[in-house]
Amino acid sequence: MASSNLIKQLQERGLVAQVTDEEALAERLAQGPIALYCGFDPTADSLHLGHLVPLLCLKRFQQAGHKPVALVGGATGLIGDPSFKAAERKLNTEETVQEWVDKIRKQVAPFLDFDCGENSAIAANNYDWFGNMNVLTFLRDIGKHFSVNQMINKEAVKQRLNREDQGISFTEFSYNLLQGYDFACLNKQYGVVLQIGGSDQWGNITSGIDLTRRLHQNQVFGLTVPLITKADGTKFGKTEGGAVWLDPKKTSPYKFYQFWINTADADVYRFLKFFTFMSIEEINALEEEDKNSGKAPRAQYVLAEQVTRLVHGEEGLQAAKRITECLFSGSLSALSEADFEQLAQDGVPMVEMEKGADLMQALVDSELQPSRGQARKTIASNAITINGEKQSDPEYFFKEEDRLFGRFTLLRRGKKNYCLICWK
């Protein structure tokens, strides 16, 4: 991405929701590299898909020659951002937040280049400047510059104040001041002149711009990326099992890959613009090819490959594709023990069983069948496979060789109904 028209290119991809003084920012970018930042609060032990667009936006700026600062909120994570939240957040302990800070910092690291000369990325933690600040300094040096009248009129806060059942604590109300001071600190320390974030962060970003101007007399800018929505109106980044996480221990690479494979046709080309580094021309060509092929579109597979490789690397992608292919073909010989562990984590329904169980009981316990009687009929009709092999004997008891790696047996009813037995 060329730096001179970077904002225009981001807009073409649908990646700009709001921007302050767009003309002045474009001029500043045209003058040469800048430093910019995006903040990630440790509200859990992993980032999720909602964090991916701003994180990739940092990467896009770095590829254009700019210096990204990834700020993990060791201090703000102790307070909690009230922006557009229906209720007060639960406060986590300092030990928990510090543990999450470490995990998120490691998670962010692979997306950015921390060793590439002038525009090497920087990892920062706002606990470094808030940890030892006393309340008098906070009120005199920061609080003095904020108008309560303006703060309560910010949309993110106003929504909470207007709810009869929920007010807002002073703790969460002060969050806006903390994030504003982050921008001022990073401007002074690293020359940061741009903050990016989700569109729900607009109020916090503009507060930081105003505070930086008051404290340092510097012009700085803000840019928000849109909160991603799906064409059918349902929430993006959620499955029946909850959020889709970037940590492979919370969402396996296989499950992550499948999430993208299941993208609706109405969303897929837009998501390619948001979540990949393919050019607009390549995405448009793929859309045209899919439209004229008369076959199932390729776009979902391209999207799943690109994003899974970005988040989980080549090894994670190949494991996800291998598991997908084996489940589709019914042949499990290519699967490793680690692949089965992914399936047990969240890939297919899983049931734990004691050794010595029979097939009918396994079908009932796994909820592949409602009763032993129904299980008997289904087995006899040749609709059950064990590790890809048909089994039509209703009196079948599992053998040692059915336990792959001594631990796993994969049952299938029909073509698509799976359950993984994990032997105790």
UniProtKB/Swiss-Prot annotation:
Acetylation among keywords: yes
Superkingdom to which the source organism belongs: Bacteria
Annotated function: Catalyzes the attachment of L-tyrosine to tRNA(Tyr) in a two-step reaction: tyrosine is first activated by ATP to form Tyr-AMP and then transferred to the acceptor end of tRNA(Tyr). Can also mischarge tRNA(Tyr) with D-tyrosine, leading to the formation of D-tyrosyl-tRNA(Tyr), which can be hydrolyzed by the D-aminoacyl-tRNA deacylase. In vitro, can also use the non-natural amino acid azatyrosine.
SMART domains xref list: S4
Gene Ontology biological-process annotations: tRNA aminoacylation; tyrosyl-tRNA aminoacylation
Site (Cross-linked with tRNA by periodate oxidation) residue list: 231, 235, 238
NCBIfam families with a match to the protein in the record: tyrS (TIGR00234)
Protein name: Tyrosine--tRNA ligase
Post-translational modification remark: Acetylated at Lys-144. Acetylation at Lys-144 leads to slightly decreased activity. In vitro, in the presence of acetyl-phosphate, can also be acetylated at Lys-67, Lys-85, Lys-90, Lys-230, Lys-235, Lys-238, Lys-321 and Lys-377. Acetylation at Lys-85, Lys-235 or Lys-238 causes dramatic decrease in activity.
Regulation of this protein's activity per its record: Magnesium is essential for activity. Inhibited by chloride and sulfate in the presence of 1 mM free Mg(2+). When the Mg(2+) concentration increases to 10 mM there is almost no chloride inhibition any more. Inhibited by diphosphate and AMP. Chloride strengthens the diphosphate inhibition and weakens the AMP inhibition. Chloride weakens the binding of Mg(2+) to the RNA and thereby the interaction between the enzyme and the RNA. Acetylation at certain lysine residues could significantly impair activity. D-tyrosine is a competitive inhibitor of L-tyrosine for the formation of tyrosyl-tRNA(Tyr).
InterPro entries (UniProt xref): aa-tRNA-synth_I_CS, aa-tRNA-synth_Ic, Rossmann-like_a/b/a_fold, S4_RNA-bd, S4_RNA-bd_sf, SYY-like_C, Tyr-tRNA-ligase, Tyr-tRNA-ligase_bac-type
Chain positions of motif 'KMSKS' region: 235-239
Consequence of changing residue 130 to S: Utilizes the non-natural amino acid azatyrosine more efficiently than tyrosine. Strong decrease in affinity for tyrosine and small increase in affinity for azatyrosine. Temperature-sensitive
Residues binding ATP: 238
Record note on biotechnological use: Utilization for in vivo protein biosynthesis of mutants that charge azatyrosine efficiently to tRNA may lead to efficient production of azatyrosine-containing alloproteins, which have immense potential in biotechnology and medicine.
Family: Belongs to the class-I aminoacyl-tRNA synthetase family. TyrS type 1 subfamily.
GO molecular function: ATP binding; protein homodimerization activity; RNA binding; tyrosine-tRNA ligase activity
Lineage: Bacteria, Pseudomonadati, Pseudomonadota, Gammaproteobacteria, Enterobacterales
Subcellular location: Cytoplasm
Entry GO CC: cytosol; membrane
